[in-house]
Amino acid sequence: MAATIEVRDLSHTYSAGTPFQHDAVKHMSFSVEKGEFLGIIGHTGSGKSTLIQHLNGLLRPTSGEILLDGTNIWQDKKTTRESRFRVGLVFQYPEYQLFEETVYRDIAFGPKNMGLSEEEIRTRVLRAAGFAGVDESLLEKSPFDLSGGQKRRVAIAGVIAMEPEVVIFDEPTAGLDPAGCASILGNIRDYQK
């Protein structure tokens, strides 16, 4: 059986062919099986965020492959699009992920792009908001009026609302207090089950 995610000889170079060329990831290979937790640790600027942006097709490798259930996610446009729904990514900085006028619309963005009915979108928004600890009273507020920790929770809810098979978190507890950290980490464990 193929690994859920397999990275084969992945390299990514920024600004290739310019004086600013930088190899962010070089010849990396690993696999992640269904149900497995994987942590990636490294110092600032070591390529962690670049690496994880490849796992759902936000970045295209300079060389190498990303396989999802044995299929190269860059095989064709349809496969790339589907991989973005199957592999959810919560950014390190929620401000990079939030852009809608209301919290509700931000959480609903992914399910709406999946072509789901309004009823299913609402169900998913409410379920994901509850999962991430986003109070219903915040759903009609602007995400830009929220605290850092609340923005983080909205960003997580927006990904969870798509019900991806794989969820990748880039520093999921940044901006949360100790109780918030414990809550989110517990919810991540629950989602994995």
Where does each model-flagged region fall?
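ABC ATPase NBD Q-loop/coupling interface
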Residues: A16, E65-E82
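The feature captures the beta-strand-to-loop junction immediately N-terminal to the Walker
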Residues: I41-H43
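Helix-to-loop junction immediately C-terminal to a conserved catalytic motif
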Residues: N56
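Conserved ABC ATPase "signature" region
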Residues: E119-S137
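Conserved ABC ATPase signature
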Residues: S142-L146, Q150
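Conserved catalytic motifs of ABC-family nucleotide-binding domains
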Residues: E163
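Catalytic Walker B motif of ABC-type/P-loop ATPase nucleotide-binding domains
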Residues: V167-D170
